[in-house]
Regions:
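Short, low-complexity N-terminal intrinsically disordered segments enriched in polar/charged residues
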Residues: 1-30
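A solvent-exposed, acidic/Ser-Thr-rich amphipathic alpha-helical stretch
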Residues: 24-92
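A beta-strand edge to alpha-helix "cap/lid" segment located at domain peripheries
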Residues: 63-148
Length: 148
C-alpha cells in the first residue's frame, strides 16, 4: 500500500475512532474543508452543520461516548497522485453495547469519499452519508431514526 493510501485509510479509521470516543468536535474537524451529503436531494453541508446534526442525533451515555464501535472495512482507494486527488469506497458496520442492549450490530452501510492533498497532507473533500443499507436496534444510539 502506498504512503498516500495509508494516509487516506487512516483518515477513515480516525473518523471512527473519534466518533466512538464521543469526540464529535474532533470528528467534525476532519471535514472542515469538505462538503457532506446527508440527504439524497438536499444541498451539501459543511463541518459546522455536521457537528450540529451529530450533536442532536447521537446519544451519549454516562461515559460520554455513544458506546459504539464503527468498523470500517473493504476500503477501495483510487489515487491520482499528479492531480492530488483520491476517492475511496468503504463499508461500515456499527456495533453497540449499552445497559439493556447486548453487543450487536446496529447499522451497516457504505461511505463514498473524496480527498484532496494540500501542502502534502491528505484531507476529506467530500463524504456521502446517504448510503445507509441496514438498520438494527437504534434506540440506544440515535435520538431519531435515519430516513430511508
Amino acid at each position: 500500500m502506498s504512503a498516500s493510501a495509508v494516509e487516506i485509510a487512516n483518515l477513515l479509521y480516525r473518523y471512527a475512532e473519534l466518533l466512538d470516543a464521543g469526540d464529535l468536535p474532533g470528528m467534525a474537524a476532519l471535514f472542515r474543508h469538505a462538503r457532506i451529503k446527508v440527504a439524497e436531494d438536499g444541498p451539501t453541508i459543511g463541518a459546522d452543520k455536521l457537528l450540529d446534526l451529530f450533536d442532536a442525533r447521537v446519544k451519549r451515555h454516562a461515559c460520554g461516548t455513544p458506546r459504539t464501535r464503527h468498523v470500517i472495512t473493504n476500503p477501495i482507494i483510487e489515487i491520482d497522485e499528479a492531480a492530488h486527488r483520491a476517492t475511496a469506497r468503504s463499508y461500515y458496520t456499527v456495533l453497540q453495547a449499552a445497559d439493556g442492549l447486548a453487543l450487536q450490530p446496529i447499522a451497516a452501510g457504505r461511505y463514498h469519499d473524496a480527498f484532496e492533498r494540500v501542502d502534502g497532507t491528505w484531507r476529506f473533500a467530500f463524504r456521502d452519508y446517504t448510503l445507509f443499507d441496514f438498520a438494527g436496534d437504534l434506540r440506544y444510539h440515535l435520538n431519531e431514526s435515519p430516513a430511508g
